[in-house]
């Protein structure tokens, strides 16, 4: 943008539309685009469900059915309890994260430029490039881990799991508790930071490539387009892979919580 230094340009594109100060500020753009992504997924899948026929299905219906069967198969192979909750959860996680990730393919200048027309100073369009969004989803998974652990073993079994393992003696309860709590907390933290780190890096690379268009050197400007295209093609793989990893780890963590043997 005219009149901006490279640092200003990058800083502007990495700034959130937020309300409040400090720890309790809310990123309004993250909330908006995550809701839009969820609504988009629900709209298309609900339309397919309403228009589903027993005859020859359309191409999009085949595509949706293929995704549903694929996710259900993954849950069946990895989670050995009832799939009534976990299968829809896994499908929602994969599709929702995928759509949020896919927003990163929109040229980086378009969202802030559109926001400027509405009098909005800052706007970031990729919810999964915001640690608050990925951490929020990971905390939900964490709560489900606790729920399925208690459901499968009872509250007493849950307490034993975190106090009498790996050393089955009352004297080691403090040590066992620290070790198990660290292991437990590492799951949502790694889940959140893996998705956030990959999507933040992807967004930053798009921004750095866009900076090349602002360069005075014609060669750098000319290199911007092929680099942008190459990274966008590669990023499609990253987008899909990160959605798959988040879904699979969710399934695996819930499976471990549900099936872990009593100690």
Swiss-Prot record:
SUPFAM superfamilies: F1F0 ATP synthase subunit A. F-type ATPases have 2 components, CF(1) - the catalytic core - and CF(0) - the membrane proton channel. CF(1) has five subunits: alpha(3), beta(3), gamma(1), delta(1), epsilon(1). CF(0) has three main subunits: a(1), b(2) and c(9-12). The alpha and beta chains form an alternating ring which encloses part of the gamma chain. CF(1) is attached to CF(0) by a central stalk formed by the gamma and epsilon chains, while a peripheral stalk is formed by the delta and b chains. Its main location: membrane. Belongs to the ATPase A chain family. NCBIfam families: ATP_synt_6_or_A, PRK05815.1-1. Key component of the proton channel; it plays a direct role in the translocation of protons across the membrane. The gene is atpB. It comes from Glaesserella parasuis serovar 5 (strain SH0165) (Haemophilus parasuis). This is ATP synthase subunit a. GO terms for biological process: proton motive force-driven plasma membrane ATP synthesis. It is found in: Cell inner membrane. Coiled coil: none annotated. InterPro entries: ATP_syn_F0_a_bact/chloroplast (IPR045082), ATP_synth_F0_asu (IPR000568), ATP_synth_F0_asu_AS (IPR023011), F0_ATP_A_sf (IPR035908). GO terms for cellular component: plasma membrane; proton-transporting ATP synthase complex.
